[in-house]
Amino acid sequence: MGRGRAPCCAKVGLNRGSWTPQEDMRLIAYIQKHGHTNWRALPKQAGLLRCGKSCRLRWINYLRPDLKRGNFTDEEEEAIIRLHGLLGNKWSKIAACLPGRTDNEIKNVWNTHLKKKVAQREKKKAGAGSGDAGTPATAPLSSATSSTTTHNSSGGSDSGDQCGTSREPDATDVCTLQPEDMDVSDMLVDGAPPAAQPMPSPSSSSSLTTCVGGVEELIELPVIDIEPEIWSIIDGESAVARHGGDAAAPCTGTGTAVSTSEAEEAAANDWWLENLEKELGLWGYAEEDTQAHPDLLDHYTGLSPLCALEGDPVSTYFQTGPAAAEPELLVVVEPSAVLL
């Protein structure tokens, strides 16, 4: 095993305990004259019955001229607290940062006074931190509500002051067209077809939206209600056109058109009844029909009902019967003519 550290000086008969004033004067005189380069050799060279460690501690802690006496100032205490937080219990390094103060007295003041002071500060910070942890949840809400109310109030005032200026670009003008006075007969007369217009491109078409001075205007077309009488007039004109009438002729009156259409429907019904009577062998106009509608036969049959029967494809589908039921000839066979 190694020798390790040298044994203590007490084993060779050196002095122990407190220093006497004569020993202090010898140590001070030697260090001022030769310095303290080697603390192990210093006691023998100075003529002291002390070990090197005892001489060093006596010089550093009590005898050096720059040593400060008295209590620590507030600045020194704050410096010790800060350095202890950085370096820990390395008292020699802390003492090197505080001139005039020894590591021993710094350790003593820390253990007796500053340690309790730091503990109280940490408790206060912990209490303040717990209180602040509960308040931020409500503080942002209150600030947010206050900012919201302020923003709303300012927005309301701004909107009230600028209601005529800031919102004008968003508003759209709606133009309504007044319906022009026109005659019903002008609507029924077929006008000249409009000239062919080129197909509008998608980029140029605005679909009833025009931009005038940067403001969009929507044109609302009026809704024209067409009365039922007008539709009846249009239906009557189309029926007359199908039967050879002039489609371009203007309507002279509502009553005349309605009566003409009713007469045409009645004539068509009579014609189908005649076909049914002809199928059943009851063909022939009654005297009331010929007297009531003398022009019906001339319009549909020409000279006679037989001519109409030959010209009508529907009538020729049915088998034609005799014009009048002729009496059948009955042959009476006498009993004498019977063959034996």
Curated annotation (Swiss-Prot):
The record's subcellular locations are: Nucleus
Q: Signal peptide span per the entry?
A: none
CC terms in the record's Gene Ontology section: nucleus
UniProt KW Nucleus keyword: yes
Tree of life domain:
Eukaryota
The record's keywords, sorted A to Z, are: Activator, DNA-binding, Nucleus, Repeat, Transcription, Transcription regulation
Ranges for domain HTH myb-type come to 11-63, 64-118
Q: What is the documented function of this protein? A: Transcription factor that positively regulates genes involved in anthocyanin biosynthesis such as A1.
- Give the protein name, as stated in the record: Myb-related protein Zm1
Q: Which organism is it from?
A: Zea mays
